[in-house]
Amino acid sequence: MPELPEVEVVRRGLAEHVTGRTVTAVRVHHPRAVRRHEAGPADLTARLLDTTITGTGRRGKYLWLTLGDGADEPLARRESNFALVVHLGMSGQMLLGDVPNANHLRIAALLDDGTTLSFVDQRTFGGWMLADLVTVDGSDVPAPVAHIARDPLDPLFDRDAVVKVLRRKHSEIKRQLLDQTVVSGIGNIYADESLWRAKINGARLASGVSRAKLAELLGAAADVMTDALAQGGTSFDSLYVNVNGESGYFDRSLDAYGREGEPCRRCGAIMRRDKFMNRSSFYCPRCQPRPRV
C-alpha cells in the first residue's frame, strides 16, 4: 500500500497540473470505486461537474483535492467548502493523460484544458468520495480524515506531544507507528526503515522506550520519508506510479525492509524477518535485539 512519500509524490504532481482547472465531465466506470461515497455514483458525478480544483491536501496516506464554485472568480477568491477525497488503497493510481490499461480504469474526469484525470485501480481497494471540510487543530481537512493524526513531515507535527502519547502505550512500538491516530503516514516499509535507523526492535513496548529514543525514532521516520520523497517513493512493482505513470526508486536504498538473509549495512549481521500483525518485520538482530521475554 502506498505510504506517505508515495502519496505526497502524487499530491505534488496533481498540485502542479490540475490546480485551477474546472471539471467538465465525469464518468464512473466501476461502482466499487465510489463505494465510500454513500450517495452513489450519480451524486458524485453531479456534484463534481463544473467545480474548480482550488488546491490539494494530504494527511498521512489520505489525499484530497479541494473544490470550489464560482468559475468566474479569480482562483484565490474562490471558496473551498468540500473536497474530493482519494484513497489509493493497494494499487490506486491518479494519472493524467492516456491510460495504459483501460481494463483497470475506474473513474475519469475531463478538465477544461482537455486533460483527463483518471483513477486506475487494479485491485479496486481504493476510491473517490466527496466530503465536507472541517477545521481540526487550525487546519481544514475532509471530515472522514479528521481522526487521522498529523504526520512527521507536517510543519505542525508536534514531536514532543507524540512522544508523550507513545510513552503511555503498553503495546509494541511498531504497532503504534502503524496506528494512524497516533502518527500518520507510516506503513510497514517505513516503520521497519525508521526502527532500523533508530536501532529499536519493533517488538519492544512503546512505554519501555525512553523519551529521547522515541524522539530519535520520530526523527528517523521524518528523515527516511524525506529521503524516499527525493527518490519518488518506493515501487516494488508497476502498481505505484506518479501522475505521469513513472515509478519511484527508493526500494534500491532500503536498509531493512525485504532484506532477510542479507548483511546489515551497519554491522554486517544477517538480517531477519519475523511475522507481525499479518505482515513481515525486517530487522538486524545485533543492532535491534529483540526484547527479553
Curated annotation (Swiss-Prot):
InterPro entries: DNA_glyclase/AP_lyase_DNA-bd (IPR015886), DNA_glyclase_Znf_dom_DNA_BS (IPR015887), Formamido-pyr_DNA_Glyclase (IPR020629), FPG_cat (IPR012319), MutM-like_N-ter (IPR035937), Ribosomal_uS13-like_H2TH (IPR010979), Znf_DNA_glyclase/AP_lyase (IPR000214), Znf_FPG/IleRS (IPR010663). Involved in base excision repair of DNA damaged by oxidation or by mutagenic agents. Acts as a DNA glycosylase that recognizes and removes damaged bases. Has a preference for oxidized purines, such as 7,8-dihydro-8-oxoguanine (8-oxoG). Has AP (apurinic/apyrimidinic) lyase activity and introduces nicks in the DNA strand. Cleaves the DNA backbone by beta-delta elimination to generate a single-strand break at the site of the removed base with both 3'- and 5'-phosphates. One of its GO terms (biological process) is base-excision repair. Keywords: DNA damage, DNA repair, DNA-binding, Glycosidase, Hydrolase, Lyase, Metal-binding, Multifunctional enzyme, Zinc, Zinc-finger. The keyword Zinc applies. Monomer. GO terms for molecular function: 8-oxo-7,8-dihydroguanine DNA N-glycosylase activity; class I DNA-(apurinic or apyrimidinic site) endonuclease activity; damaged DNA binding; zinc ion binding. NCBIfam families: fpg, PRK01103.1. A zinc finger (FPG-type) spans 255-289. DNA binds at H104, R123, K169. Its cofactor is Zn(2+). Signal peptide: none annotated. Binds 1 zinc ion per subunit. This is Formamidopyrimidine-DNA glycosylase. Belongs to the FPG family. The keyword DNA repair applies. Its EC number is 3.2.2.23, 4.2.99.18. The active site is at P2, E3, K61, R279. It catalyses: Hydrolysis of DNA containing ring-opened 7-methylguanine residues, releasing 2,6-diamino-4-hydroxy-5-(N-methyl)formamidopyrimidine; 2'-deoxyribonucleotide-(2'-deoxyribose 5'-phosphate)-2'-deoxyribonucleotide-DNA = a 3'-end 2'-deoxyribonucleotide-(2,3-dehydro-2,3-deoxyribose 5'-phosphate)-DNA + a 5'-end 5'-phospho-2'-deoxyribonucleoside-DNA + H(+).
